Amino acid sequence: MKNQVSIRLNSTLGLLSMLMFGSVSAQSDTANWPSQNLNIENSRYSTLDQIDTSNVDQLTMLWSFEPGLRDDIAQVTPLVVDGVMYLHSRATMYALDATTGEELWRRSLDSGPANGPVRGSTYAEGRVYAYRGADLYAFDAATGAALASFGDSGFLKVVAQGLHHQYPDTYPTDIDPITI
């Protein structure tokens, strides 16, 4: 199982690295992939055109990355923003140089149990957001430092806070949200 995950990850990372950085200087503004499905519209489409049916058989792996036994990232869509690849596992957030595969930073996501697959993280305005279980993390994309201004020093218990939220007594419970 670990070998299958490793092979899939290596293949995906190698292909993504070539797709994103093979020769994108003319299209550098479209080389970023900041969220799981590219953008808020979930378009899943890149305008990069360096790889097509005429040259796909010439691809070779440039580098690979082994996250470790504890970090299952088999179903993660890596993000690529400004030459940095971000990978979010069940237990760790990684930042890698997308051209070389060199690890730039890693941060633990250690707030409790994390069941089920991890689908990926999101990048916005110099921040990387990742989740584990019912908790959300925010990191500075350049340094990996937890963002002190987000939640409890970079960590937010989303479900716990949502379940304990008290609406004011004057909240109109009989109004349809669309009419508000």
Segments the model singles out, each with a brief description of its role:
Residues 1-8:
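N-terminal secretory signal peptides that target proteins for export/translocation
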Residues 10-23:
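Bacterial N-terminal signal peptides
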Residues 27-69, 102-111, 145-168:
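Aromatic (tryptophan-biased) beta-strands that constitute blades/sheets of beta-rich domains
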Residues 32-37, 71-91, 114-136, 168-180:
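Repeat-blade elements of multi-bladed beta-propeller folds
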